[in-house]
Regions:
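A short beta-strand-loop element at or near the start of a globular domain
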Residues: 41-49
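Short, small-residue-biased leader/transition segments that mark boundaries at the very start
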Residues: 2-4
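Short amphipathic
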Residues: 21-32, 49
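Short, surface-exposed terminal/edge motifs of secreted or surface/virion proteins that either
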Residues: 6-17
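Terminal beta-strand-rich extracellular "head" domains
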Residues: 28, 34-37, 42, 54-136, ...
Length: 178
């Protein structure tokens, strides 16, 4: 937990005030993760999760996520990720559009023509969340691909053809007075 000097009193601003950072949490996720889920559904990225406990019920949480994602040598597919918030057992997907059958926080299309070398890409998203609680709020990253049953494998922090090509993924949570 960190308090930004000269930004906000440690207990936050008076109710109705706006602006100011109360606390910042950061996770540098450097583990290699892979999923060969055959359904194309979302899976949790093990250990790519972080919690913050807001000091105020009306605070917003600035969520910034950067995912280093890769693919295997098999086929082109859509790599996608999403962020989920859990408060007291209630899970909510956040940072997604209000509609769409493939709603996601971020993603990209990877087309691996003729088994060309698959790459690793960084995808960043930043958005405000309003959990409206002073209880612990957990944020986690999930990944998926678009080709169920295809043998597609998604990776976090490496590309598909070699574990020597590595990346690092990050999550930053900032409690901001609204």
């Amino acid at each position: 937990e960190m308090c930004i000097r000269d930004s906000v009193p440690r207990d936050g601003l008076p109710s109705g005030s706006s602006g100011g950072i109360i606390q910042v949490k950061n996770l540098e996720f450097d583990e290699i993760f892979s999923s060969s889920d055959t359904t194309g559904g979302y899976v949790d990225v093990t250990n790519f999760t972080m919690s913050i406990t807001p000091t105020r019920n009306d605070s917003k949480i600035l969520v910034s996520v950067d995912v280093a994602g890769g693919m295997n040598d098999n086929v082109g597919f859509n790599f996608r990720y999403r962020v989920q918030r859990t408060v007291g057992g209630t899970v909510t997907t956040i940072g997604i559009p209000p509609s769409g059958s493939y709603a996601m926080t971020g993603g990209y299309n990877l087309y691996n023509e003729n088994n060309a070398v698959p790459y690793i890409f960084g995808m960043s998203r930043t958005f405000f969340d309003s959990p409206a609680t002073t209880s612990s709020v957990n944020y986690k990253v999930q990944v998926s691909h678009s080709h169920a049953g295809s043998g597609a494998v998604v990776y976090v922090n490496r590309r598909g053809s070699s574990s020597n090509w590595r990346g690092i993924s990050t999550m930053t949570l900032m409690e901001v007075c609204s």
